[in-house]
């Protein structure tokens, strides 16, 4: 699609350790996509500061993270009461389950503290993972998608999604706020 629209030369994709992104960029960028990474890093605030430093004033952040509330709800619905009472410790060191599920309010606070302007929040899979009849995820997909779309930006459903997607802008006024912190 980017080739068809003639914008492919305006894009630059970098795959590297998040902590190293700044050294791979020649100038500030317009948009950073940071999906399903925050829940794997031990120092999330440091990473968010690094992302801030890579964006131009007015640039956007697309952030998606594994939601601790969704993990709790999933385990409660599954009847894993003992596991929840133990604080849901990670069972194995190397699994596909994220090391650090994130509390949404904490992530929002970190973003705002840095200077991001949060413009939208969306729960991802707010109902899908909680269906008792798993076959409905496929058999009733159109209805499920319509309801997910209808409720994904409303509380309490937003905060119960398996993931949360946040769109945030680096404001013009605060564009130099974090320079010394990176």
Role assignments for model-derived ranges:
Residues 5-20:
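Conserved SAM-binding strand-loop segment of SAM-dependent methyltransferases
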Residues 36-37:
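Short catalytic micro-motifs in class I SAM-dependent methyltransferases
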Residues 60-87:
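Conserved class I S-adenosyl-L-methionine
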Residues 33:
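A conserved beta-strand element that flanks and buttresses the S-adenosyl-L-methionine
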Residues 96-121:
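Short alpha-helix
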Residues 20-26:
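Short conserved loop adjoining the S-adenosyl-L-methionine
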Residues 45-60:
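A short glycine-rich, Lys/Arg-flanked "PGG" loop and its adjoining helix->strand segment in the class I
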Residues 120-174:
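A C-terminal cap/extension of S-adenosyl-L-methionine-dependent methyltransferases
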């Amino acid at each position: 699609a980017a080739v068809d629209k003639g914008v492919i030369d305006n894009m630059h994709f970098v795959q590297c350790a998040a902590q190293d992104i700044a050294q791979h960029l020649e100038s500030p960028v317009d948009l950073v996509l940071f999906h399903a990474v925050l829940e794997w890093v031990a120092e999330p605030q440091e990473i968010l500061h690094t992302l801030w430093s890579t964006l131009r004033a007015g640039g956007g952040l697309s952030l998606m993270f594994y939601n601790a509330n969704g993990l709790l709800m999933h385990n409660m619905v599954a009847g894993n009461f003992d596991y929840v009472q133990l604080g849901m410790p990670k069972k194995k060191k190397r699994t596909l389950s994220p090391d650090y599920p994130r509390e949404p309010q904490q992530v929002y606070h970190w973003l705002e503290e840095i200077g991001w302007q949060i413009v939208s929040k969306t729960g991802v899979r707010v109902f899908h993972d909680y269906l008792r009849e798993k076959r409905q995820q496929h058999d009733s997909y159109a209805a499920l998608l319509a309801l997910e779309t209808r409720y994904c930006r409303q509380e309490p459903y937003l905060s119960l999604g398996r993931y949360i997607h946040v769109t945030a802008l680096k404001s013009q006024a605060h564009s130099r706020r974090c320079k010394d912190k990176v």
